[in-house]
Amino acid sequence: MALYEHVFLARQDVTSQQVESMIEAYKGVIESNGGKVEKTEMWGVKSLAYRIKKNRKAHFTLLNIDAPPAALAEMERQMRISEDILRFLTIRVDALEGEPSAMMQKRDRDERKDRERGRRRDDDGYVGERNEEG
């Protein structure tokens, strides 16, 4: 079977729970066609470089997939039909990475720096001072 990295962008209006249910549905498609999803990473809501279908932000998600090409073709067909998916990209790779992706490592570094400075980030990326009073 072939190895793939698949990234998709879901509309900003969709909740995190809905994104998780989409991931489970796409995992089901892959598994029913003889493949499996090795790793899933939700990168969160990020700003887009330009508007896509009237959206300025999107939920970014990475799937590492070990599946036959037919399974991937079916998943991509379903993503094209879905109105909640703005874009997707699938790349065939020689080996899947076992460690967290560069996006997850960057997010972890940023969170660590903020903790060291006594700051926190909210969901929109706003950095503010910690309120120690409660």
Curated annotation (Swiss-Prot):
GO terms for cellular component: cytosolic small ribosomal subunit. Belongs to the bacterial ribosomal protein bS6 family. Gene3D superfamilies: 3.30.70.60. Keywords: Ribonucleoprotein, Ribosomal protein, RNA-binding, rRNA-binding. NCBIfam families: S6 (TIGR00166). PANTHER family: MITOCHONDRIAL 28S RIBOSOMAL PROTEIN S6, SMALL RIBOSOMAL SUBUNIT PROTEIN BS6M. The keyword RNA-binding applies. The keyword Cytoplasm does not apply. SUPFAM superfamilies: Ribosomal protein S6 (SSF54995). It comes from Methylobacterium sp. (strain 4-46). One of its GO terms (biological process) is translation. Binds together with bS18 to 16S ribosomal RNA. Residues 99-134 are annotated as: Disordered. Residues 105-134 have a biased composition (Basic and acidic residues). This is Small ribosomal subunit protein bS6. GO terms for molecular function: small ribosomal subunit rRNA binding; structural constituent of ribosome. It comes from the Bacteria.
